[in-house]
Design a protein with these regions (language model features):
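An intracellular "coupling" helix at the cytosolic face of ABC transporter transmembrane type-1 domains
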Residues: 38-46, 134, 151-160, 164, ...
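ABC ATPase nucleotide-binding domain helical subdomain, centered on the C-loop/LSGGQ "ABC signature"
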Residues: 123, 421, 429, 454-495, ...
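Cytosolic ends of transmembrane helices, especially the final helix of ABC transmembrane type-1 domains
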Residues: 243, 267, 316-343, 352
Length: 615
């Protein structure tokens, strides 16, 4: 999945499907029909086809206007009926009103169906992303996924609401106009059409060039989007490191590369575009000349027929000149379709046949694991047993494999060897949703959404009552903080909970975990963001939360896990030792060192209220 990794490749054909033959507009339109059938309900499909039908009715009305104009050229000057001009004008007004009705209905129905299609494609993609393993998700580019869910799906909406119906109308209009031209004079029609065929060959070259330009644009836009995401996510570090100028320069380079590449591609296509528009005009001129050369022949057209022919020739210019913008959108749609297909092609996490376990002991048998692309094992030959209802703490120096071990226990990654059993069965034999319903996770990096406090809490239990929310919040020592917010539990949080402090976000996540009431609990640095006073209160909440649950805890502050049933001491991906706090203090030198460092950090963590400020 090269195109969805974090690596950059500025090639138009990069990506999962890039090496395949690029489809033409007809395949793209058929692909749209498949999307409509796949994602839209029968009712919305009927809405879309009704919109397309109204669009065709509008085209018929346009042709009727041309027919009335042609009839007026032939008959108005020869008729003595004074009412004929009024009748002609009345018919034109009626056609205008009909066109207004057809256009309004077409736009309404096509827009409803198009936005419905966009919603369903986005929903389908999100469901597919959710069904991927965490390891797979982490290997994808957040910027490119965001671009696909926004811009690429938007082009699908545009294609269904505007481009495909417009192409159908223009093809119909050109067909009817040339049929009329052939009926009046096949020489005029054939001459104009012959010149136009040359333009069609050039149009093929233009389509190929546009496709190349827009694929390159899409690749580089994805890189720019990725840079924006990285810039936003690393803003606090960038400012703290005074690296704003460096990052801005890098971002400017990305934008400049996009500008230069796109401008170069556009400049290369300008000669072909200009030639195509010239040929369109030339086809009209050649048709008129063909009629003029036959002016004195026995088969010459009458003056009124010549005027009608000229009118029809000029009428061909409107749909022909509209082809290039439609090809542009169609090419963008195909790029978007490729990106959507690439996400859909990413394998989802395999789900086993077993429902939720009825026992919650965890057995780890000789597991090893290396991150993709690395040869150094992150976890090597680790074995232990955690009885149901026990508390297991995982400690060790930075980089020792604590979090990786927890991720493996959560089935985020596939093991290289060994097995992990939950309730006597391999964790991979459980249905994915059943497994995640069994466990609750509180990570060091808390995930909060741009929604109300109550809705963020209800991610743990969608059916939780207000009373249950408040009880969980009190256990996590966050209720008073929530009530101090402007709208209490109905207060909207900023992006990633930006209106709360780090400790408050952590406690909100703990309250959410309390609500879920899963039998297996994972706490990754659960109290790392809390001050000493709140840490004691949270510890009391954990005592009630963890009753009769199988609990795994990772913590820097070793004082929070001294009462754990067992402590796993990790070092360089291996299990150095395991036991209770007292047992490890008596025999494990690494744990002794970690404990001494912890005590030293606690001793030096003070406030100095009486210390004078430095001037």
């Amino acid at each position: 999945m090269k195109n969805w990794s974090h690596s950059k490749a500025h090639t138009p054909d990069s990506g999962l499907l890039g090496g395949e033959k690029k489809p033409g507009p007809e395949q793209i339109i058929m692909g749209l029909f498949n999307r409509l059938q796949q994602h839209l309900s029968p009712k919305l499909q009927r809405v879309w086809f009704k919109g397309l039908l109204y669009k065709q009715f509008d085209t018929v009305a346009i042709m009727a206007q041309l027919a009335i104009a042609a009839w007026a050229i032939t008959h108005l000057g020869e008729s003595d009926n004074p009412m004929l001009p009024l009748i002609t004008l009345g018919l034109l007004v009626i056609l205008l009103l009909l066109r207004f009705t057809f256009m309004a209905r077409a736009l309404c129905k096509l827009t409803i169906a198009a936005y419905g299609l966009g919603i369903e494609i986005r929903r389908s993609l999100l469901q597919h992303l959710v069904s991927m393993s965490v390891a797979t998700i982490r290997g994808l580019s957040a910027g490119k996924i965001a671009l696909t869910l926004s811009e690429d799906v938007q082009w699908q909406e545009n294609q269904s609401a505007y481009t495909t119906p417009q192409i159908a109308c223009q093809v119909m209009m050109l067909t009817l106009i040339y049929l009329a031209l052939f009926w009046f004079d096949w020489v005029v029609a054939g001459s104009a059409l012959l010149v136009l065929m040359v333009g069609m060959f050039i149009l093929g070259a233009i389509r190929k060039k546009l496709d190349e330009i827009l694929r390159l644009r899409a690749t580089m836009m994805a890189d720019v989007s990725e840079a924006i995401v990285e810039y936003a996510q690393g803003m606090s570090f960038i400012r703290a490191a005074a690296a704003t100028t460096t990052v801005e320069q890098r971002f400017d380079r990305e934008i400049d590369q996009l500008r230069v590449a796109f401008r170069r591609g556009v400049f290369r296509s300008i000669p072909l575009l200009s030639l195509f528009y010239i040929i369109i005009d030339t086809s009209v001129v050649v048709g008129i000349l063909a009629g003029a050369l036959r002016f004195n022949s026995p088969e010459a057209l009458t003056l009124s027929e010549i005027l009608i022919t000229i009118l029809l020739l000029f009428a061909t210019m409107t749909p022909l000149r509209g082809i290039i913008p439609l090809l542009n959108i169609t090419a963008l749609t195909q790029v978007g379709e490729t990106h959507i297909a690439e996400i859909e092609a990413v394998a989802t996490q395999a789900s086993g046949p077993l429902a939720a376990p009825d026992k919650y002991d965890v057995e780890v048998n000789n597991i090893s694991f290396s991150y993709p692309g690395t040869n150094q094992p992150a976890i090597q030959n680790v074995s232990f047993y955690a009885p149901q209802g026990s508390m297991t703490a995982i400690v060790g120096p930075s980089g020792s494999g604590k979090s990786t071990l927890a991720y493996l226990l959560l089935s985020f990654y596939q093991l290289d060897k060994g097995e992990i059993r939950l309730g006597g069965n391999d964790i991979h034999h459980y249905q994915t949703q059943a497994l995640y319903d069994t466990v609750t996770m509180v990570f060091q990096e808390t995930a909060l959404f741009q929604d109300t406090v109550a809705n963020n809490l209800r991610l743990g239990d969608p059916g939780a009552t207000q009373l249950e929310l408040e009880q969980a919040a009190r256990l996590a020592n966050i209720h008073d903080t929530i009530m101090a917010l402007p709208q209490g539990y109905d207060t909207p949080l900023g992006v990633d909970g930006g209106t709360l402090s780090g400790g408050e976000r952590q406690r909100l996540a703990i309250a959410r975990a309390i609500l879920k009431q899963s039998p297996v609990l994972f706490l990754d640095e659960a109290t790392a963001s809390l001050d000493p006073e709140n840490e004691q209160l949270i510890q009391q909440a954990f005592d009630s939360l963890t009753q009769n649950k199988t609990v795994f805890v990772i913590a820097h502050r070793l004082s929070t896990i001294t009462r754990a049933d067992q402590i796993l001491v990790m070092d360089h991906g291996t299990l150095c030792d395991s036991g209770t706090h007292d047992e490890l203090l008596g025999r494990c030198s690494l744990y002794q060192s970690l404990w001494e460092n912890h005590l030293g950090s606690e001793e030096h963590w003070h406030l100095y209220p009486n210390k004078p400020n430095k001037v």
